[in-house]
């Protein structure tokens, strides 16, 4: 097994009526949890990293880890650039071996968004790299980028088709009421908008900001065309809270191989639930 593109993963999901979860990882332990759980459940998953994660861990290191784990667990894995904004940064990582990219120019006016995304698509497709882009903008914080709720806006269905055709992207991230981070109360997702987008666009659709969504809402979005579900904050929260609890209860603990186990276990529960919600168990 090897590192693969997400294009075939998402096309399979679109045909099969399920979604592939993209889990944001931050270090060796969080990657281990995702890969081990996915392998045990025979589920397709995407290993996602923001620019901050790639800076923290190193592109070559992350690629080597994903490749090694794909072979160790005999499980196909994709490593994905999440919310990357700079062409040169994306190009360097693609040349290093990354085969799935999200170029996020959603903060730009429509025409400039198209122009920026098309530049990345034209480059990436030369390397058989799949490209995701976003139309509309989610509120909340992702890495060090903060978008106020007042500045967030939903995806326009008619523009979505123009955007997809003009850029040549492989998947489209939509804004239908989710936000980055955890929710203080259940969000009101615009399912009718999503259904309308699906009628205008034949590409696999992507939902960001899925941390904390109910099983019912996730499964409804999948029925309406979502093929990729992004989860980040919920993983971090489970991992960090379990770690804090363990160290509070065991102040004498000094061995990371011991005190990280409870954190991994808590995160594993979240990964397992998301895989179940996505309906992708046994689909790898």
UniProtKB/Swiss-Prot annotation:
Residues given in the record as dihydroxyacetone phosphate binding sites: 181, 209-211, 230-233
EC number: 4.1.2.40
GO molecular-function term, one example from the UniProt record: zinc ion binding
Gene Ontology BP annotations: D-tagatose 6-phosphate catabolic process; galactitol catabolic process
Pathway(s) annotated for this protein in UniProt: Carbohydrate metabolism; D-tagatose 6-phosphate degradation; D-glyceraldehyde 3-phosphate and glycerone phosphate from D-tagatose 6-phosphate: step 2/2
Keywords: Galactitol metabolism, Lyase, Metal-binding, Zinc
Transmembrane segments: none
Required co-factors: Zn(2+)
Residues forming the catalytic site: 82
SUPFAM superfamilies: Aldolase
Catalytic activity: D-tagatofuranose 1,6-bisphosphate = D-glyceraldehyde 3-phosphate + dihydroxyacetone phosphate
Cofactor details (free text): Binds 1 zinc ion per subunit.
A Pfam short name: F_bP_aldolase
InterPro entries cross-referenced by the UniProt entry: Aldolase_TIM, Class_II_FBP_aldolase, FBA_II, TagBP_ald_KbaY/GatY, TagBP_aldolase_GatY
Enzyme class: lyase
Annotated positions binding Zn(2+): 83, 180, 208
One GO CC term on file: cytosol
Functional summary from the UniProt entry: Catalytic subunit of the tagatose-1,6-bisphosphate aldolase GatYZ, which catalyzes the reversible aldol condensation of dihydroxyacetone phosphate (DHAP or glycerone-phosphate) with glyceraldehyde 3-phosphate (G3P) to produce tagatose 1,6-bisphosphate (TBP). Requires GatZ subunit for full activity and stability. Is involved in the catabolism of galactitol.
Family named by the database record: Belongs to the class II fructose-bisphosphate aldolase family. TagBP aldolase GatY subfamily.
Subunit structure: Forms a complex with GatZ.
Name of the protein in its database record: D-tagatose-1,6-bisphosphate aldolase subunit GatY
Species, as recorded: Escherichia coli (strain 55989 / EAEC)
């Amino acid at each position: 097994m090897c590192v693969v593109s997400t294009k075939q993963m998402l096309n399979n999901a679109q045909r099969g009526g399920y979604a592939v979860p993209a889990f944001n990882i931050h270090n060796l332990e969080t990657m281990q949890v995702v890969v081990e759980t996915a392998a045990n459940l025979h589920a397709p998953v995407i290993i996602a990293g923001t620019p901050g994660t790639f800076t923290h861990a190193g592109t070559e290191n992350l690629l080597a880890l994903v490749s090694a784990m794909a072979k160790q667990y005999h499980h196909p894995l994709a490593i994905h650039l999440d919310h990357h904004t700079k062409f040169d940064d994306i190009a360097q990582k693609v040349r290093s071996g990354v085969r799935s990219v999200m170029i996020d120019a959603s903060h730009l006016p429509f025409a400039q968004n198209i122009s920026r995304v098309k530049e990345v698509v034209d480059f990436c497709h030369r390397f058989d790299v799949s490209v995701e882009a976003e139309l509309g903008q989610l509120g909340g914080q992702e890495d060090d980028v903060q978008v106020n709720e007042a500045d967030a806006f939903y995806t326009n269905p008619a523009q979505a088709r123009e955007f997809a055709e003009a850029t040549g992207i492989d998947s489209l991230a939509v804004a239908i009421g989710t936000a980055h981070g955890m929710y203080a109360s259940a969000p009101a997702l615009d399912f009718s908008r999503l259904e309308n987008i699906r009628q205008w666009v034949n590409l696999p659709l992507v939902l960001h900001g899925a941390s904390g969504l109910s099983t019912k809402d996730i499964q409804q979005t999948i029925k309406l065309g979502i093929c990729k579900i992004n989860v980040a904050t919920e993983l971090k929260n489970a991992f960090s809270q379990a770690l804090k609890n363990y160290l509070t209860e065991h102040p004498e603990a000094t061995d990371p191989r011991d005190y990280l186990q409870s954190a991994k276990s808590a995160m594993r529960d979240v990964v397992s639930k998301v895989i179940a919600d996505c309906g992708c168990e046994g689909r790898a």
